[in-house]
């Protein structure tokens, strides 16, 4: 996970933050987060979900394996307990949280079943969500561009469907499921392209791997795949969520 996200907080926010901040509210609603609870944000990144939980009057702790993101979290939330730790090895005792949440995380951990089992160990309720690939306009357009220009983009594809999320959590108990839809806006295509070039995640690594000729072809084809926007535009994204009360 960390090798795809060894970037600064500003770069991550520029690329994905415009989506993750909008997702945090619906995800917290789905997870049943209530004021006064104690919650753990697993794979907290730069703190989009953390900020939402704090705003709801929740006592929050956060974990992320990336040293860069852990530093950002401590700077942005100096009063919170932040641990540099992977989802598969959380440094808290059994049952100390009311809820453990992982937003946009499980596709990128080395052992997702171990991660959700560890979340179930430390919390009485577990909730996870991941973007679908085809259901996110940006990723779908990038995939089509990759196919047209003949490059070799890679993206973790597991846990990107409702069934995969259900099956991941099913060993822990009865699973509740939901689809969470958000939109993100851009001033213009240049803003979108610049965010993509920040090197964040699989999409950013794909862009960084292209030579000058392929990069220019990607720039032109992706513009076409997004509908050749001439000004402000929005892109849709859908996350598949699951929650369980381990029993």
Residue ranges and their predicted role:
Residues 113-125:
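A short glycine-rich, Lys/Arg-flanked "PGG" loop and its adjoining helix->strand segment in the class I
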Residues 104-107:
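Short catalytic micro-motifs in class I SAM-dependent methyltransferases
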